[in-house]
A protein has these predicted regions:
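C-terminal partner/receptor-binding element of secreted or periplasmic proteins
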Residues: 446-468
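Small/flexible residues
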Residues: 7-10, 214, 445
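Short, well-ordered beta-strand elements
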Residues: 437-447
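Beta-propeller-forming repeat regions
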Residues: 19, 24-380, 386, 391-394, ...
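Sec-dependent N-terminal signal peptides of Gram-positive bacterial secreted proteins and lipoproteins
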Residues: 3-29
Length: 468
């Protein structure tokens, strides 16, 4: 959101005071004090001091604790919101003796700040606060996600700002439970919608619902649903089964929401929700299997733009040569990335375009692309040494009786900057790049040169993941 200049200054000041008001004991000036229990917390100074005064006057100077969103861009207990033609306000999140957080609405009038409303929230912890114009009236709504104590699900409330003269400055437009959420213009009408994903872990079902709002509330005539895989489950207690949710184009002009979900500790799936012209669709949901099969992989790798071409690719994995009979914990993988554009051919199925195949070293933060010849002939494999931080590439070929690893072709290594600067440690290695305190380098053997590997080839296929 773009704030007016005065509100940008206000935001920076409130962020500073929020740090001062965190619920912990401090040293120095605040040594010996518990900030949660201060009757009169540290004051804002200058022209903005009236904001805190307005809050405390509305609370009749009783003690309170400021509450902070756990996630998202807005992390302050004081959140300035520009409501456009309806004005502007500061939303103060606080808690007193009750179980639930309150939202206090503070406005400026004739140079003075005053509280015009105070409403009880949905729960005791705020997960995130977002704003978007969901009903098309030119003024944003406030979307608050609340943590719940019973499960990994959350609760959502959407408020509209009705102005200073209304009985309540904030009015509730909708509320719903959800497991995953995205604000997105999915149907391409230049109006944001609310996409909620809900998992029923008891019945092993899941549903995505696309909500359109009007000034009167939910547009029930234009609410769209799509089935999702109900077998997703969180990997840690209290976590979401959805590992990542992002919006990107499926093809030119068609937005989609890419949802990476966990299936236990070992498997990951990607679901793609998009507008099919008349409703909401899940590209990969198999109604026969009642789950997502096509994108399931024994890997925690998420969908991403792996080659920086502007499109999201979805990974699939297969064992590198020589690792087929290894235990799962010992396997090294070749990850092949596919781009889908959402079109489905009756004969060939979904239009999947192979983008690249690579081995990913997630520990050291890089991947190396395999040429198609290496992939099709299964002619190269890797041995990894976590102690030396090396990945050694070997030829893999038929010896007359079986396939086996033969000549060392090259070694990729991650050095610390200090070790790299010691010429005795990096002998024979050639520089590839660096990130932070890590330097990446390669040593190419004579067999590797005979195999067609040179420094230009390595640089072309070596990618530092942090650069994506």
């Amino acid at each position: 959101m773009k704030y007016p200049r005065k509100w940008k200054l206000l935001l920076s000041l409130l962020a500073a005071v929020s740090v001062m008001l965190t619920g912990c004991s401090g040293g120095g000036l605040f040594a010996g004090f518990d900030m949660n229990n201060l009757m009169k917390p540290p004051k804002l100074t200058g022209s903005q001091s009236g904001i805190q005064q307005a809050l405390e006057q509305s609370l009749k100077n009783k003690s309170y604790t400021l509450k902070y969103p756990k996630s998202g861009k807005e992390r302050s207990a004081f959140i300035p919101v520009d409501f456009g033609k309806k004005g502007a306000a500061v939303l103060a999140l606080y808690k007193q003796d009750g179980a639930k957080i309150h939202i206090n609405v503070i406005v400026e009038q004739d140079g003075a700040y005053r509280s015009i409303d105070d409403i009880e929230g949905a729960d005791s912890e705020v997960y995130a606060v977002q704003t978007a114009d969901l009903d098309g009236d030119g003024s944003v709504e406030v979307i608050i996600s609340w943590l719940t104590t019973s499960s990994s699900d959350k609760w959502l409330t959407v408020y509209s700002f009705d102005g200073e003269e209304a009985e309540h400055a904030l009015s509730l437009k909708m509320e719903a439970g959800f497991t995953g959420m995205q604000i997105v213009d999915l149907d391409g009408d230049s109006q944001d919608e609310l996409l909620l994903m809900q998992v029923d872990s008891t019945n092993k079902t899941a549903m995505a619902t696309l909500y359109r709002l009007t000034p009167d509330g939910i547009d029930n005539e234009h609410m769209y649903k799509a089935m999702m895989d109900g077998n997703v489950s969180p990997r840690t207690t209290g976590a979401s089964p959805y590992l990542d949710i992002k919006t990107a184009q499926l093809r030119s002009g068609i937005n989609a929401v890419f949802v990476d979900g966990a299936k236990g500790s070992e498997y990951t799936i990607t679901e793609v929700l998009y507008w099919n012209g008349s409703g909401l669709s899940n590209l990969f949901y198999d109604y026969t299997a009642e789950s997502v099969v096509e994108t399931m992989r024994p890997s925690s790798m998420l969908s991403m733009d792996i080659n920086k071409d502007g499109w999201i690719e979805i990974p699939q994995v297969s064992e590198l040569p020589g690792y087929f009979d290894k235990k799962a914990s010992e396997k090294l993988w070749l990850t092949t990335w596919y781009r889908y554009d959402g079109r489905v051919d009756e004969e060939t199925g979904k239009d999947a375009q192979k983008v690249l195949s690579c081995n990913i070293n997630s520990t050291d933060g890089y991947y190396f692309s395999f040429p198609e010849e290496w992939v099709s002939k299964q002619s190269v494999t890797i041995e990894r040494n976590s102690t030396d931080r090396t990945s050694s590439f070997y030829a893999y070929e038929w010896d007359g009786e079986s396939f086996r690893r033969t000549d060392l072709l090259m070694t990729l290594r991650a050095f610390t900057s200090a070790v790299w600067e010691n010429s005795g440690s990096n002998a024979g290695y050639e520089y590839l790049g660096e990130h932070g305190s890590v330097v990446y380098a390669v040593k190419i053997s004579r067999s590797g040169a005979d195999f067609g590997i040179d420094l230009d080839f390595v640089k072309e296929n070596f990618v530092i993941m942090a650069d994506l």
